[in-house]
Amino acid sequence: LHLVKNATFHDGKPITSEDVAFSIETVKANHPFKTMFEPVQTVETPDPHTAVLKLSKPHPALELAMSSQLLSIIPKHIYGDGQDPKKHPRNSENVVGSGAFKLVEFKKGQHIILERNENYFIEGKPCLDKIVIRIIKDNNARIIALEKGEVHMAAFEAGPSDINRLKKSKNLTVSATSGPKCGMMS
């Protein structure tokens, strides 16, 4: 793997092959999908921007396993302190990631506020300055918030009457798919 040379964590420290190796080993030891990384025997780090994965057998799903949903690259300089990564204090305070948005505020049961990472390694991205994720537990309250324009998107279980009600709103575009969840955007 060849890493993007100007990619950094939110604290400004560079993302290195050591972080990749550490992240893979952490996932192999702790993640519910650790079997996705079972064929990875070792991760060599010949230089800061190169990680070489040595496999015990071919792994056709390696690219999927390396996706951000299964393998987020975490900073070794923070999580390499020997504490349990699942209970690490930096999971909830002074969170450091590497994505397009930085966590600014998390209020359990209320909201999550993310702000644009000005140092994101892809120029011109992200396109938004801020994302506010409101936690609205009640379906009716979610629908009312959509109708009033208080939220721009909602994902929830919606029955036919909810979908028909929202389709009547001039400010909403409703896209429903089969399955247990649907999302609405205004």
PLM segments and residue spans:
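Extracytoplasmic
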Residues: 15, 38, 46-50, 96-98, ...
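Short, well-ordered beta-strand elements
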Residues: 1-2, 20-23, 51-53, 99-102, ...
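Surface-exposed binding/hinge segments that line
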Residues: 2, 8, 35-80
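Aromatic- and charge-enriched surface segment that lines or borders ligand/interaction sites
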Residues: 1-33, 46, 52, 142-145
